[in-house]
Amino acid sequence: SSVNTTITPSSDLGGNASPTPLYVIDGFIADEGAFNNLDINEVENVTVLKDAAAAVYGARAAYGVVLVKTKQGKVGAPKISYSGQFGYTDALMLPKMLNAYDYGRIYNAARAANTATKDQESDDLRVQLFQSDELEAMKGMNYNLLDKEWSAALTQRHSVNISGGTEKATYFGGVSYYQQEGNIGRLDYNRWNYRAGVNANISKWMKASLQVSGNYGETNKPKNVKGGGSDGDFESLMLHVPYVPDQVNGYYIFHSGMENITNPSDQQKYNFAAVQNASDNVENQNQNFSLNGSLEYDFGWSKYLRGLKVKASYSKNISTGKTNTIGTKIDVYRLISRGGSGGHLYVGDEIEYNANTLGLYELNNGNSLGRSMNRSDSYQMNLTVSYARQFGKHYVSGLFSIEKAESEWEDLNGSLTDPLPFTDGQSSSVDSNAEGFAQTVTFNRSESGMLSYVGRVNYSYDDKYLFEFMLRSDASAKFAPQNYWGMFPSWSAGWVISDEKWFDKDKTKIDFLKIRGSFGILGKDNVNAWLWTQLYTRNPDKGPIFGTNSSTNTSATIRMPKQGVNPDVHWDKTYKTNFGIDMAFLKNRMSANLDFYYDMGREMFASHQGTSYYPNTVGIQPAPENFGEVDTYGVELSLGWKDKIGKDMSYWVKLTTGYNDNKIRETGWKAAYDFDKLVRNERSDRGLWGYECIGMFRSYQEINEYFDKYSITKYLGNTKENVHPGMLIYKDVRGQYDESTGTFGPADGIVDEQDYIKISHRASNPYGGTLNFGFSYKDFSISAQFGASWGAYSLVPTTMRKESYSEYSNVSAMWKDMFVYEDIYDANNIVTVAQNRNAKYPNIRYSSVNGAPSTFWKVSAATVQLRNMTVAYALPKEWLKIIGISSCRFNLTWFVVSFLNPYPEGAWASWAGSYGYYPNLRKFTLGVNVSF
């Protein structure tokens, strides 16, 4: 289970960092994997920081910070709790594809579409089509392998925690187990988590803490070379032609095309079921161990040093991984003699399945044994001196911290080819005498380090006037020694107006009013290391050979990298400005928060483009430089209401919405003109561009009239002779671009990409909102979250609108109503597809024309989703006392229900994921929490 988290909009032009936040677990920096591996029952609370509030964490906090505090022990008798959860995950939706009969009909209509060339009258063509008797038989066939192989995946989670302690020491311990199945094929994932910690008061002025945590995860799945992973398997099953079974009478069948080819490729021989049921396997084991400790001394015993504390902390993390793989050659079969009058069917009463009718083939599923091991070690040390003290109405605090962190990572990979059929996965179980036998070993290693100094001063007067100044200095070894260090200051201030004596809360009905502002500078080092120095690599061949013996046929050469060197590359800078207002009304029942932010990215990593700046004669690619500039800005509004009705009923609602945008000030501008290229001082979202569709050619007369009326000479690279009914009609908008004047000529009779128009001013939704609400009555409660986004249009996915007829691939169900110029006949002169000139969709034969981006495929990008909803009930405590239980709560939760689907015929939806890829999932869980 993983979480994709975005706190602030991305403002990068280059570099290699993804716009993900920094994760901090119990005060120590952690990676996203450690965050995802946390068990929910280990977590006490999660806090999100952004803008200047995140500046204390330096360069890595440019996209915000997720602070996680895990559970700690509390003073009291031992308290034991159990949490159990059972659930299942399923696809938000599966793509709707053509059934067997419609596939055959659409295939025929597309295959015989070029009526101008009289292909329809060709006997050779008619034999290659599905015959009428075959189509009739296909009405009873529908081998939907995606529907067959896809299933809801079960999950379960169990955890047991214990906590307690005295004034001297508190403790917490917990262990949890999580298990998840896959939605497609054979997949099993198991993970154990453990965490134990103790906080001890060594003396009145000294305390220490120690925490040990870790997890062990194991994944088992089939070795699958040709499937291409989860996404590849999903696409393969989705596109499987629905009249071909994957197995008959225990034989794994592969589709050999309309002509029953005898020399198929491994991709054509691929059979998902055969791979899933083979012994080929991938086993992955991952272990993570963390040790955190701290020692704090309080100078509260001194009248003059009271408020001063010194804290030393240390964190050590070790992660190891091991993967074992085995891939063999799997037997699959081609049906030599197929059924139907055209010889295209795989199932029928007249078909036999035996050694004479089945041809045996081998599917190469890797044919190798593999081992890989990796290990990463990291540590973080902090020494922090803090001071906080109240002097009357004056509150002063300060902090100085030194942080040092280092990490190293290495892996080792080995493989052997040609495992023996009876292999148990041992290295000796291979045929080293086989032709092409190979043994390979590779290894990699990397290391990194950071050193930081942090200083912060806070002052407040009467809790009304709040001020903070912070300075952080970071060093990164990614830069040349003279550029290691970056200095990043920040300032913030706040004023609680509602605490002023002159502020009348009764008259204004405002219980709380605060204004705040902040300004800070953050930096990033998101470039590859060693860009500042010249590096060389060794090429084992292509070198000269002088004076060696006749058996020497290779010689090593020294090779320069593909990218240039830039010794001046240094920290980039983001100037972050934030202004906010916090309010509470009507006896604090209503709240409002308004935030404005403006971020100016300067000296950002970017690369110049175009031969005018970097001629081809240089011979290498330009290195990143610090010249990019981008401004990102936005506003966020939050409105909340909470109240009680009577003694036992309460409810709350919170609405959050916002808007964000950006302007590109400087980057590596494209030399050639392009409609959607970045433009100085305009947003990076260039909108959606494509042709203006003005109809569909439904006859040759319409084609002639169009070419004559607009004096068309070229239509997407085609002359009139190659334009046919069933193609979309695009408008000739303008002529060619004149670089000298920066303008376009008038319509020139050539329809090409120069005729693009702006289909949508936005390619992604600029507006969004979230509605959270909840209700409780005694021991019963409901909470939910709705989300929506709007403000843009999108296009039907390229892979969906550019689908073409293929004897090996099915197509979306939307093509069921496809243009057919005239009746299509089989070899017996029987109509297999009736004329359909009033169809909604063009003919997929011409996907290169019809699949181009155009207004024909324009759909709304708006989304509305029920992101999650939980119904909970706590059993009355008087019932539980009898059996010694302090509390018991049941909850039912479901995630992600979508309401809008603008896609044609509902065949797919944007909220379901990318067409042809593993879909987004919804989840339902039933849980119970018991405390003793």
Language model features with spans:
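Extracellular/periplasmic, surface-exposed regions of secreted and cell-surface proteins
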Residues: 125, 191, 197-206, 211-216, ...
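Short, solvent-exposed loop/turn motifs
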Residues: 29-30, 252, 259, 395, ...
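Extracytoplasmic gating/loop element in the C-terminal half of outer-membrane beta-barrel translocons
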Residues: 270, 274-277, 344, 789-889, ...
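Short, T/G/N/S-enriched strand-turn elements that build extracellular solenoid repeat scaffolds
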Residues: 35-38, 881
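Conserved small-residue
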Residues: 81-136, 642-761, 803, 810-815, ...
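Membrane-proximal, glycine/serine-rich, low-complexity loop/turn segments characteristic
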Residues: 1-22, 28, 35, 53-296, ...
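Short aromatic-centered micro-motifs
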Residues: 23, 459, 745, 775
